[in-house]
Amino acid sequence: MDQSGMEIPVTLIIKAPNQKYSDQTISCFLNWTVGKLKTHLSNVYPSKPLTKDQRLVYSGRLLPDHLQLKDILRKQDEYHMVHLVCTSRTPPSSPKSSTNRESHEALASSSNSSSDHSGSTTPSSGQETLSLAVGSSSEGLRQRTLPQAQTDQAQSHQFPYVMQGNVDNQFPGQAAPPGFPVYPAFSPLQMLWWQQMYAHQYYMQYQAAVSAQATSNVNPTQPTTSQPLNLAHVPGEEPPPAPNLVAQENRPMNENVQMNAQGGPVLNEEDFNRDWLDWMYTFSRAAILLSIVYFYSSFSRFIMVMGAMLLVYLHQAGWFPFRQEGGHQQAPNNNAEVNNDGQNANNLELEEMERLMDDGLEDESGEDGGEDASAIQRPGLMASAWSFITTFFTSLIPEGPPQVAN
């Protein structure tokens, strides 16, 4: 019963992937193995493939020979699609050999036709035909290599640095692997000419790079060498550019100038284009603020607030600066002196050096004198308290506009 149940017929549709043969319908049994099915196909299939060359694929799976069909095929399908792939034992011939074979056959047929037409031919005429055939083939080879040689010349002209590495490989017999024929694209004279052109081009580029580097190295050294030369000519005096530098440092700057990102002064349109409506808005805000202070405080507080606002306004306008340094007051006087006589700067520097030397001698005179001077320079308690209070309250007031433009 089991064997009769196992021998159930099943229909397989064998498809060839190369579409060389049409789909073949094969009847077999479920108890067959894949190897037995291959043996059956080697007898039934039109191409008669060998068993070892067959590959059966079912549902994207390669079927091994030991499996049975009942374990592979789906029972709900009536027809089962199996793809047959056969390995090729004879490799395809190259088209180059076929063309050579055709050319040889054409030569043989032409020689036979010429011999039949002339009746009897001498060996010399046969040699002439062979020489003509060889000449035609050599002309074909020459025509075939001519475009390649032209492209090689163009490439070598565009990229001359490639020629240096390929010079040794172009000559026959040098750096050529054994067993390979060498067909040089250029003659030795052409190769020497290309090498000379490459050397000339390389020399010109090298000279340009060296000259550019020399000029870049000379330019930054000129300012550094000019100063020692001036010092050598005038050893006892300061160099002439010193008064100019002092004049530039003591030159009065334009105050209250704002700079924009492009480097020019900022033109504040609000200062120039303020119409009557803007002024009315400003006065109304000030009136509202003063009315609130007047009605919700006493008269004395109102006077204090008015005085504080007036003080802040004068400080913002620059009429009443709280933190004015002495350097800004002395700058116009120094600038006038420098403009009148350039030697005054040197005299001031000499006087400053003499004063420092005198101070150093006074400091070395005795320890008691130094202690007395330090005691005299120490501020008192009241002066410290007054400076602390004034500094604290003046720091609460906002600073005015910048005095020096950036």
Curated annotation (Swiss-Prot):
Its main location: membrane. SUPFAM superfamilies: Ubiquitin-like (SSF54236). CDD domains: Ubl_HERP2 (cd17119). The keyword Transcription regulation does not apply. Residues 86-154 are annotated as: Disordered. The keyword Ligase does not apply. It is a single-pass membrane protein. Residues 127-154 have a biased composition (Polar residues). One of its GO terms (cellular component) is membrane. It is found in: Membrane. GO terms for biological process: endoplasmic reticulum unfolded protein response; spermatogenesis. Residues 10-89 form the Ubiquitin-like domain. PROSITE patterns: UBIQUITIN_2. The chain crosses the membrane at residues 302-322. Keywords: Membrane, Transmembrane, Transmembrane helix, Unfolded protein response. Residues 87-98, 106-126 have a biased composition (Low complexity). PANTHER family: HOMOCYSTEINE-RESPONSIVE ENDOPLASMIC RETICULUM-RESIDENT UBIQUITIN-LIKE DOMAIN MEMBER 2 PROTEIN, HOMOCYSTEINE-RESPONSIVE ENDOPLASMIC RETICULUM-RESIDENT UNIQUITIN-LIKE DOMAIN HERPUD PROTEIN FAMILY MEMBER. This is Homocysteine-responsive endoplasmic reticulum-resident ubiquitin-like domain member 2 protein.
